[in-house]
């Protein structure tokens, strides 16, 4: 079903047995995908520039990352996966197993419609959270501002936070918190891109914009870059994540809860 939903041909596979490695009733499923694109149509940091808009696409839930943390919280609170949780409107197990939203067709359609002049980069928010993944598609010297107050954090994330007594810093460094995909686009087409995503049935909103530090090392409205990573007001500057030296993401504002 996932291959059909994303337009991906399934060209091969195998069922391998590993005696002595896995228990008789255990199984593991793994897959890999390969894509091909013309060099002239590659998206990435070299297309991102000052003034670009940073657009969020809503996640469907936890997606496929952070389950080590989630399992520890479930164990800590002693919750049954079959128990009904009022704030979810369904059982805990059903909420935790909500399928990961697939963005492939939507992202391809946006590039087809707006071209590489309009769509500059995509960032899939996986392990490490929003800022760690977004920073990797930004060029060095560039900062993307992200306003935490621009969306309401889905209930499942606050359940994990409260149940595990996890700080918001720990949460945003581990889980997607409601943002599954980010598009960095030309400001000139931002409103049209937003409309197209929403028309496709995926909630979208502007997270922030792309800027650069001034010659004096300051970011307009936030002060010195060198002092932001330890700002007591909740402002965080994140860069150099996952072994990639690229741009940076400046998180500010407070999360909204439903």
Map each language-model feature to its residues.
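Glycine-/charge-enriched secondary-structure boundary and capping motifs
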Residues: 1-6, 22-27, 87-97, 101-258
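Acidic, glycine-rich loop-and-beta core segments that form the ion-binding/anion-interacting portion
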Residues: 48-95
């Amino acid at each position: 079903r996932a291959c059909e939903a994303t337009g991906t041909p399934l060209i091969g596979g195998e069922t391998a047995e590993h005696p002595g490695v896995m228990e008789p009733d255990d199984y593991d499923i793994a897959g890999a995908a390969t894509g091909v694109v013309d060099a002239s149509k590659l998206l990435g940091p070299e297309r991102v520039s000052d003034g670009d808009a940073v657009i969020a696409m809503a996640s469907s839930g936890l997606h496929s990352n952070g389950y080590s943390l989630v399992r520890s919280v479930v164990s800590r609170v002693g919750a049954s996966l079959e128990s009904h949780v009022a704030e979810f409107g369904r059982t805990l197990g059903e909420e935790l197993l909500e399928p990961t939203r697939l963005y492939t067709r939507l992202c391809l359609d946006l590039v087809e419609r707006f071209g590489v002049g309009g769509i500059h980069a995509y960032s899939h928010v996986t392990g490490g959270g929003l800022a760690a993944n977004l920073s990797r598609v930004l060029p060095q010297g560039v900062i993307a501002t992200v306003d935490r107050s621009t969306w309401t954090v889905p209930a499942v994330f606050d359940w994990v936070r409260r149940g595990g007594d996890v700080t918001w810093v720990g949460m945003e460094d581990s889980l997607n918190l409601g943002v599954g995909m980010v598009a960095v686009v030309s400001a000139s087409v931002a409103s049209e891109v937003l409309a197209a995503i929403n028309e496709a049935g995926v909630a979208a909103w502007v997270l922030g914009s792309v800027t650069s530090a001034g010659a004096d090392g300051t970011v307009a409205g936030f002060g010195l870059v060198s002092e932001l990573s330890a700002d007591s007001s909740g402002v965080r500057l994140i860069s150099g994540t996952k072994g990639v030296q690229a741009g940076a993401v400046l998180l500010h504002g407070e999360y909204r809860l439903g």
